[in-house]
Amino acid sequence: DRQDPIADIVYTFEGGTNNVVFSWTGPNLNGVNAVIPSGTNSLVISGTPSVNITATTQYPYQVITDGSACSPEIVYTGVIEVKPEELLVLASAPATENQTICAGTGTNTLEPIIYNLEQEAISAVVSFTPALPGIGYTLTSSQVIISGVAQAAAQASTTIRTFLYEVETTGCGPARESGTITILPTPVMSLYAGDENQPSVCNNSPIEPIDYIFNPQSGATFSITWDQ
């Protein structure tokens, strides 16, 4: 992982040499250096990779003794392999990342939320806060798919409930993406005051007021129709 330090690689030199030379034999690995600590006969390769890569990349190097009393010089070679930071990319429509839906199989159900696994990501997990009954996820070789039908247990009777989901890859990085799924309550309306079935009234005379209350949190509006 290019964000994690490598384990130190230490070479010691002795005998007929008092120095070694380090070099990259391929591309330089930024963030990783080789030094000989003062007063020692050791070469230490250490650091944290800092490179812009989208696939696993190998960085070969060599260490050669220098100025030895006898030849030939000794050559050691090695490779440091760096994996890219994994990436999650929303593949479904932008509007799917945060949705407001209803419970049950009626209208306004969840449209699948799909993230592509990129830059060598091969797995991910999805968590819901709080738990969201009826909604889960599936994992393919290249995608994470959040889908399902919100159960009635996810729905409050009169208030809106919001659930946070987070997608996290399991490898380098890791990559994280999040969004919300909001569950509307079911529509509720009840008679508050007055008589639904009014007694006969004379023309041009007022009726007794009839009051209904409903829950606007469900997103419902009202309309009046007259039965002829």
What are these regions (language model features)?
Residues 55-68, 157-171, 212:
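A short beta-strand micro-motif common to beta-rich folds, especially ectodomain repeats
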Residues 70-85, 173-186:
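C-terminal edge beta-strand
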Residues 14-19, 29, 117-123, 215-221:
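Short proline/glycine-enriched turn/loop motifs at strand-loop junctions of beta-rich domains
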Residues 21-43, 125-145, 221-228:
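Low-complexity "stalk/linker" and mucin-like segments enriched in Ser/Thr/Pro/Ala/Gly
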Residues 85-95, 186-195:
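Proline-enriched interdomain boundary motifs that mark the N-terminal boundary
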Residues 44-54, 145-157:
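Extracellular/luminal low-complexity segments enriched in Ser/Thr/Pro
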Residues 1, 95-103, 195-202:
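Short beta-strand segments of immunoglobulin-like
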Residues 4-12, 106-115, 205-214:
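A short beta-strand segment in extracellular, disulfide-stabilized domains
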